[in-house]
Amino acid sequence: MSLRKKVFLLMIVVVAGLLLSFFLIYRSVSNSIINSVRSNTENQAKALSKFVVEKLNNVTNVARSAATYLGSQFFEAYMITNQLKTTVEKEKSTFAFAFSALSFNKSAALTDGNRVDRVDFADYEKYIKAVEGKDIFFMPETFQGTPVLTVVVPIETMNTRTGIVGFGINLSENSDLWKAVVEEGKASKSGYGLLVTSDGKVLIHKDMGNFMKDVKELGGFEKAFEEAKSGGEKYVEYEYNGEKKYTVWEKVPGYDFYIFSTGYLEELLAEGRKATLGTIVTYVVFGGVIFAVLFVSMMPVVKRMRQQVEKVKRFGEGDLTVEFEAKGRDELTQIEESLKEAALSLKEMIVSIIEAAKELSGASEEIKVLSEESHKMSENLHEEAKKILDEANNMSSALTEVTSGVEEVAASAQNISKITQDLTERSEAVTKAAREGTERVEAVGGVINKLKGSAERQRDYLRELVDSAKTIGEIVDTISSIAEQTNLLALNAAIEAARAGEAGRGFAVVADEIRKLAEESQRATEDIAKMLSSLRTTIEHVENGSKEMFEGVDEIAVMGEEVTKRFREILGRIEEINSMIENTAATAQEQGAAAEEMASAMDNVTKIVEGVVESLNRMESLIEDQTTSAAKVSQAAERLSELSEQLSTLVQKFKV
């Protein structure tokens, strides 16, 4: 084990001893606190039970005194209860109500301290039966939503029970008894007290929603209640909802009630931890001093040895720059001096080897690089020569083809020139025809516009004709109406003439003529109406047909505009084609002259290229010989480079 580990082991032993001391102190203090709390809580429960006894005794004494006094007066129940009202009113925090019930007259009354009410005697017979054979009776119940403990005492007159007197002890959160039990019964900050009947029913709890519940339903009190019923251990520890709790019980002397005082152990132990904090701080300071003394005395030696071990490790890995310093007169200093001498001797030897290896490596690298470059250049030159030779051969073949092609181009250029001239003449004819077509389309457009105007006017005439037919129809209806009225008048006139006898005969002839004229007018109007009906039908057909014609004219007008637009575009494109044909003709004439000159020049170039090809064939054979020699030199240089790299690898392990 190294010295450093031994030092740390010693420190760990010291710290472990301190921790063990802390634990023993904590256990001792915790046990002392628990014993002290147990004793204090038992005394607290006894004191609380005495308080409950005094409270219950006071209530029972008041009830008995009232029963004794009232039993000798032969009062009616209402009058008895009216006297109890003052007692309830003065002690609201103790009493919730009072009542009396008399058996001989079946009367009963109740007071809450504010008023007295007559009540049904039958509702209180249960109390009379419950107190039979007893001098006092307690009944837990709820009065107007308030939990109470009802105390019932019999009224005796001349050794005969004539009724009962009862008081309801207030058990709500506002009552003195609740505050005393819950607040004074807490064994810790979050604890509380309980008042429970002998059959396990809860009378007082910090949450009065648990009133009259079985104490076993609350959780955690089962063991304490069993000990109370059996008269066993008064201090009970248990775990509830993951927390350690304790409960102390005490029986209320003279009554079948139990007081339970409960609290949380953790809250009490927290107080104990505060008490032991000073002792723990003292131990911590003492341990810190010991730790500091060990650290100051041992760490310099450990640090020096670690430094030397690190230097030896680096020296063994080849780092010759390590310097061993010999300071002091101890054994560690002698080791440092021996290491220093060995390092100097080895360093001189390695430096010489490194320098020789560097020179050899540099020379071999230069030879290798030069030979590789020479070999690569030879290979590249050979490849380039092949490419040039291939290109020259290709060029010679291409020049031959180009020469024949140029001659063909010259002949074709002349043909193209003639063709373009013919094409120019024909395109001009097409242009002329397109212009004439455009003019005719525009003329057709004018005619279509006139037709459209005529159609619009015809549409207006038809509308006027329809309106006139409607007017005539209205006039005919008027005439028909007049004819009917005239016929009616003629009929009336004939009737009057008949009444007048001979004097009215001339008038009857006139009336008959008027009637005939009216009938003819009626027939004429009917004929006119039939003709108008036929005319209207014809007009409707004409109007429907004219609508279709108008729509067709509109479509023709739109299509005429579109055709005119397309003709104009065609004319523009034809003019562009004419311009391109003229340019092509001029270019063809120029290319014909140039092609003849190119054919002559290409013959001369072909001859020169053939001479170059012969020279390249001779140069290729020379380059192949040079490439073979360069490859041999490169192989020898590569072998020398490998040997120098091996030597460099060996000496690189050392750092000087």
From Swiss-Prot:
Q: What is its main location?
A: membrane
PROSITE patterns (UniProt xref): CHEMOTAXIS_TRANSDUC_2, HAMP
Task: Identify the domain of life.
Answer: Bacteria
Q: Which residues carry this modification: Glutamate methyl ester (Glu)?
A: 401, 407, 590, 596
Give the subcellular location.
Cell membrane
- What InterPro entries is this protein classified in? dCache_1 (IPR033479), HAMP_dom (IPR003660), MCP_chemotaxis (IPR051310), MCPsignal_dom (IPR004089)
- Gene3D superfamilies xref list: 6.10.340.10, Methyl-accepting chemotaxis protein (1.10.287.950), PAS domain (3.30.450.20)
* Record function comment: Chemotactic-signal transducers respond to changes in the concentration of attractants and repellents in the environment, transduce a signal from the outside to the inside of the cell, and facilitate sensory adaptation through the variation of the level of methylation.
Family of this protein: Belongs to the methyl-accepting chemotaxis (MCP) protein family.
**Protein name, UniProt field:** Methyl-accepting chemotaxis protein 1
